[in-house]
Design a protein with these regions (language model features):
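Cell wall/extracellular polymer interaction/catalysis modules
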Residues: 33-197, 217-236
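Conserved structured core elements
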Residues: 8, 212-215, 219
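Active-site nucleophilic cysteine motif
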Residues: 107-108, 206-213
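Secretory targeting and sorting signals
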Residues: 1-32
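Alpha-helical hydrophobic/aromatic positions enriched in membrane-embedded helices and signal peptides
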Residues: 99, 205-206
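Immediate flanking context of iron-sulfur cluster ligation sites
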Residues: 199-204
């Protein structure tokens, strides 16, 4: 008996079927997008940050202080009892804040780094203050609103800047965190200007920073911060 050769098209189809296996209906189910759950009193959800601090002015230069941590299903308040302290000029929207007004900018801000007398155990980038550590506030300087490590700062620059060791000695900057206000591309004058907005210890008022009136709570806050969790501070007027 003479066998007839099979058509090449049929052979190709059979080979493909053998490789793929039996057909079955395809079912594709898209994963549901996580639902944003906002930290109390803020518009920050766990999709943006899992560490949120809230400083809410209630009257004068004082207000409430809270730290919230996302535990995977809900926000948990983790701070010790403490009050927030604000600039003696009050709290203003960050877009309206101007240098030299002693006002605290309101808004939601990320953080740059921590600093002080020694790392208390934080995962944040940390700088130790020395006798030659300055924070430059002179608008004419290239490193305006930046740390400068120099033992020979010109008098004209020093007059409008802060020698950080002086504030360490007074207890205010033993531990502190740089708040990312007017930092990335700083405005040197006009609206949304000003330098050196920190989180630090304070009792009654600040020059525009956010203060905590408990050194133990401040130290615990610095230790708690983890850049992998994208911490933010929410300042409310």
């Amino acid at each position: 008996m003479i066998r007839r050769p099979r058509p090449r098209r049929l052979l190709t189809a059979l080979a493909t079927a053998a490789a793929v296996g039996p057909a079955s209906p395809a079912t594709v189910t898209a994963a549901a997008a996580p639902r944003p759950i906002y930290a109390p009193g803020t518009s920050v959800s766990q999709l943006q940050s899992t560490q949120v601090m809230v400083a809410d002015r209630t009257s004068g230069t004082k207000g409430t202080w809270a730290r919230y941590s996302w535990n995977g299903s809900r926000w948990v308040r983790v701070n010790a009892n403490a009050a927030a302290v604000f600039g003696r000029g009050g709290v203003v929207p960050s877009a309206q804040r101007r240098q030299g007004t002693s006002t605290t900018p309101a808004g939601t801000f990320s953080l740059v780094h921590a600093f002080g007398v020694g790392n208390p155990g934080t995962r944040m980038p940390y700088r130790r203050v020395t006798r030659c550590s300055w924070w430059i506030q002179h608008p004419g300087q290239r490193d305006y609103n930046r740390w400068r490590e120099s033992c020979s700062v010109p008098a004209s620059v020093a007059r409008s800047s802060e020698r950080l060791q002086s504030y360490v000695d007074s207890g205010l900057y033993r531990q502190a965190v740089v708040i990312r206000y007017n930092y990335t591309t700083p405005n040197r004058s006009g609206a949304h200007s000003g330098a050196e907005i920190f989180l630090h210890y304070a009792r009654s008022y600040t020059g525009g920073c956010v203060g905590i009136d408990s050194m133990s709570e401040l130290t615990a806050t610095v230790r708690w911060l983890d850049p992998a969790r994208k911490p933010v501070i929410v300042v409310k007027a």
